[in-house]
Each structure stands twice: as structure tokens, then as C-alpha cells.
């Protein structure tokens, strides 16, 4: 009898151990819904782990691997804050600015809207540009603005949606839409609200101000640039693209990435500066 009880006890232990393993496996196979604990990846098959098999192709969540981000480049070499500098007015000469705007087609809605005077006035309203600025940064800024606005053809997004996200800080105003406007195509109520707060302008109540005033349009674009893009200038032009539209990077939209690079190379050439390194993302 004692022997039989021992056998039953051992069988029960084995059963419970097996059940525990099966339960754990069931949870790990459901990580696409429940996620993984700690710094683990949820694989394409629903398992949690930390190796390439989990964090590589098909990874659903967690610190999934992508192509490695560019290693920060020292500001003294390939960064956008390196190289020749000058005041905004001396860098944005009439000839340089006109060489960009002269390519805007006659049928473009923003033909004649973006002016050199507006760009300089907007830049000088930011402390970062009151002294001298790297020519590479100006080339990069204008390259990104040019790409986002269709080579300065547009001041408003073609597909004009509502773009209202619930917010107690920057609530959407009745009848107002927060679609892309200006050279960076600033979008969503929370961006209009934050930009307006920084600039001292009622952009939540009057988002169309960005499309009416070229100075405000450039100010909003520069607000976004200073807040989100300027911190990565030392990493090269590719890092600015990642900050503006990271979905294009790592093979997402190679043609769009190259378009941005082409604008940048063109403007660097016109300003007489080398482009630095890490151009793509």
C-alpha cells in the first residue's frame, strides 16, 4: 500500500510539473496579445525570448531588432552642426533662396507664398539662430522642408482630414481641422497647441494662420525642427529623416529617403559645403 501511495504521489508531482510547463508555454505562445515580461521580444510565432530568432524578422513587440541606428558622429566631422557657419541673413542670400523658389511651378498653390524675408524673420525669433548657424543645418532644414511641401509647392495638405486626438491640454476647437500646413506639414491638434504655446499664437483656435502667414508657417516648421530634429544634428542628415518620418527608414520607403538626400546634396552644393556622413537612414 505504501508503495502504491508513493507511486501515486510521484505521478501527481510529474503531472503538476507538466501542467506548469504547459501553462507557461501557453502564456508564451500568446505574447502577441499579452506581451513579454522585461526586456524580451515576442517572436512571429508568439514566443518570448531575447535572441535573433525572437527579436528579428517578424518580431511583434518588445525591443525588436531593426537595422542599427547610425552611430552618432562627432560634431567636428560629419554632423550637421559642423563646418562653415554664418548668420541667417548671410547664409540665406537672395540668390540662394531664389534658386530654390524659382523652381516652384506656376500651378502650385504656394507659388510666391514662401519668402526669404519670412524665413529670416522666423529664424531670428529662435534663440538658436540669433548668432551664427552651420550651413549644413540650413541645407538640411530646407531639404526636409522642401520634401515635405512638394518642393515648396504646397502650404496645405491635399487630403485635409480632421486630425483631432482627444486631449485635455490641447482640445480640438469646434469646426477646426488640424491637417498638415506649412513647409513641415505640421499635423494634429496637440502639435498646433504646443507650437502655438511656444510661439504665443492662438493656433488651436486658428490653425489656418499657418497657411495665411509665411512667417508663421516657417516658425511652426522651425519649432518642430528645434524640438524634435535639432538634438540629433551631430548624427548626420539621415538622423533628421528618421526623426521626421522614421517609417521611411530601414527600407520602408527608399525613394522618399533618396528624395530627401537629393535635396540636401543640392542645397549643400549651392552653399559651398560638404554634406558630411550618414546621409541615409
Swiss-Prot record:
It is an enzyme of class 3 (hydrolase). Residues 29-66 form the Chitin-binding type-1 domain. Residues 1-28 form the signal peptide. Keywords: Carbohydrate metabolism, Chitin degradation, Chitin-binding, Disulfide bond, Glycoprotein, Glycosidase, Hydrolase, Plant defense, Polysaccharide degradation, Signal. One of its GO terms (molecular function) is chitin binding. The active site is at 148 (proton donor). It comes from the Eukaryota. Residues 86-281 are annotated as: Catalytic. Belongs to the glycosyl hydrolase 19 family. Chitinase class I subfamily. This is Endochitinase At2g43610. It comes from Arabidopsis thaliana (Mouse-ear cress). The lineage of its organism: Eukaryota, Viridiplantae, Streptophyta, Embryophyta, Tracheophyta.
